[in-house]
Design a protein with these regions (language model features):
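Well-ordered secondary-structure scaffolds
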Residues: 61-64, 68, 78, 82-226
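Active-site cofactor/substrate anionic-group-binding motifs, chiefly glycine-
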Residues: 1-2
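Short acidic, glycine/serine/threonine-rich loops at helix termini
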Residues: 6-10, 41-43, 49-53, 95-100, ...
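Glycine-rich tight-turn/loop motif centered on a GG-T
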Residues: 11-21, 55-62, 95-99
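Short, structured segments at the rim of ligand-binding sites
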Residues: 6, 22, 187
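Phosphate/diphosphate-binding glycine-rich loops and adjacent basic-rich segments that engage nucleotide
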Residues: 32-79
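Short linear loop/turn motifs
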Residues: 23-33, 46, 213-219
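A glycine-rich helix N-cap at a beta->alpha junction
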Residues: 11-37, 107-113, 117
Length: 226
């Protein structure tokens, strides 16, 4: 079924006070104030997706390409995006077990998003083994903070750099992906990416003192297994 492994929202909610249930006005305020936000699908953003999600779970259509496409792209289109980078997993631990299946899904999502006026690329990521070194909501928050600190596992960092570089090139912030890669490496190394994450946490409900501690010593905020 869906929802048993924990998604991005579950991981962020391991941070005390982090509010992912933003309405459209709160999303716009966050983007205006700190340049980014991460929010869960809700009744104001693609309300039909919640219904589709539940239907997929009980009708054995979790891996249906049209339904996956509808679920993912509906939310992106509702946000009014101009550019989108999709990370399509493939391998034993993914819904799409083979590269052929993953390419079919990627093509479906790119075609649908492009048809809605969203400049889109899809990148395939191997999921025959875990990415990074941490598994579990709180632990993956710790690993993510380590990457933002300029450290972290090399494969997780590489995903961030490659996908970020693609988005920078697509939006014209960088001349090409090579320049985008250099810019991504720079913001991870100089701490500015970490600063933006801290500001986003505060904007989305985390106490300032907690956010400050999170970016310095995440284990003290989200905890670790005994």
């Amino acid at each position: 079924g869906l929802g048993h492994t924990g998604g991005t929202i579950d991981k962020l909610e391991a941070i005390p006070g982090f509010n992912c249930a933003l309405d459209p006005q709160a999303m716009m305020e966050a983007v205006e104030n700190v340049g980014c936000c991460i929010a869960v699908q809700n009744e104001a953003i693609a309300p039909a997706d919640g219904v589709l999600y539940a239907i997929r779970d009980v009708t054995d259509t979790i891996d249906s390409v049209p339904l996956i496409t509808a679920s993912i792209i509906s939310k992106k289109a509702a946000e009014g995006l101009s550019a989108l980078v999709l990370d399509v997993k493939t391998g034993r631990a993914a819904f799409m077990k083979t590269q052929e299946q993953a390419r079919e899904l990627a093509a479906s999502m790119v075609q649908t998003a492009e048809g809605l006026g969203i400049q889109t690329v899809a990148q395939l990521t191997a999921m025959d083994q875990p990415i990074g070194t941490h598994i579990g909501n709180a632990l993956e928050v710790i690993e993510s903070v380590r990457v933002l600190q300029g450290e972290g596992s090399p494969d997780t960092r590489e995903l961030v750099v490659v996908q970020g570089a693609a988005l920078l090139a697509m939006t014209g912030v960088s001349a090409d992906r090579d320049e985008g890669r250099r810019r991504m490496e720079a913001v991870l190394n100089n701490g500015s990416a970490l600063d933006h994450f801290r500001e986003m946490c505060i904007q989305q409900g985390v106490e300032e003192e907690t956010a400050q501690l999170l970016v310095r010593n995440p284990e003290r905020v989200v905890g670790t297994a005994p």
